Amino acid sequence: MIELANKNAKSSGLSNTSFIEASITSIPLPDSSVDCIISNCVINLVPKNDKPTVFQEIARILKPGGRVAVSDILARKELPGSIVNDMALYVGCVAGASQIAEYEEYLQRAGFEGMAYILSQKESIFAD
């Protein structure tokens, strides 16, 4: 994956990017060393108890004035066990979805402010 990312960056003419493989709860980078962090359907795969640590790590490595873009599926209410325990839905980033209020709390506790949310799908993909 790293090799492909480096290849794509090079073919796109990007010289100020780097990629590492690491645990999202313990990122081996210095404090305040990253300009921008992009996460696409990753945090949903982190166990619920570790999600606050993810946002603390993001805040730790982000430079002052840096930016974070996260794309994840969020739930409006608690997911039932039939969804949470479905491995296919876990792999599809659905079963690990946090509630919107939980996400906001994780971000605020990590010190983030000025957050903007874009809700791209207002309808539930699951019947009530």
Task: Please place each PLM-identified region on the residue numbering.
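Conserved SAM-binding loop
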Residues: 5-6
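Conserved SAM-binding strand-loop segment of SAM-dependent methyltransferases
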Residues: 12-26
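A short acidic, Gly/Pro-enriched loop at the edge of an enzyme's catalytic core
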Residues: 25-37
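A short SAM/SAH-binding and catalytic strip from SAM-dependent methyltransferases
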Residues: 35-49
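A short glycine-rich, Lys/Arg-flanked "PGG" loop and its adjoining helix->strand segment in the class I
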Residues: 52-67
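Short, glycine-/aromatic-enriched active-site segment of Class I SAM-dependent methyltransferases
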Residues: 74-94
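Short alpha-helix
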Residues: 96-111, 117
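Conserved catalytic loop of SAM-dependent methyltransferase domains
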Residues: 111-128
